[in-house]
């Protein structure tokens, strides 16, 4: 097996058995201990496992996310690839809504369509879009979150009642087979409200977000139309998404669709 295939298989094993050891990886995949350790290091870097003495377990509840600068730097190449693929889903004249995700920021940067109207809760995305002459920008009001460079609160949700868009682009801090999750109530409320004012919901999620569960559940997969990601999904995750009629776009090479 190639490494990525082993990594997916290791996660599947952990979902069934809760814990895996270096020796088990060596036995299951006929690899050396050094290769088994490299696989675990890779999964740990992706946030998909927690390493223990001699092995690994799946991560438990994630309690925090980094500030804006930290999130922007994390998995930056994956986010760039996903952002470009998501921007390719936008057509001339589309009315769009964008949340304050750093992956969505890359979609805003890559946007090449003309005559778009964009509603956003992100001051960074609004600033980027000012460089695009044929784009009209609406910024939601509310409380400014200095840590995440975005607005939130009752005023922002109330303002959404003035808009309805063709497409909503959102990121997520965590995605499991139960759906999307966020670290705080404000994010959950705002994203849910945005979904009520969009014909199509497009979620941008790099590989590090899978298997990560945060305190507040946002929505299940029935509320999503398209998922744009950068790596192959586990069979269980793919089955859950397709059962909810979610279109999967792999942002690698020639964008693949399921």
For each feature predicted by the language model, list its residue ranges.
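Conserved phosphate- and dinucleotide-binding cores of soluble alpha/beta proteins
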Residues: 2-5, 11-12, 19-25, 45, ...
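Amphipathic, positively biased hydrophobic alpha-helical segments used for protein targeting
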Residues: 65-66, 97, 104, 182, ...
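Active-site-adjacent beta-strand anchor residues
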Residues: 97-98, 119, 184, 230
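HTH-adjacent hinge/linker in prokaryotic transcriptional regulators
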Residues: 2-23, 27-28, 34-100, 108-113, ...
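Short glycine/serine/threonine-rich phosphate/pyrophosphate-binding segments
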Residues: 103-107, 210-213
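Short, active-site-adjacent cap segments at secondary-structure transitions
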Residues: 57, 103-106, 126, 176-177
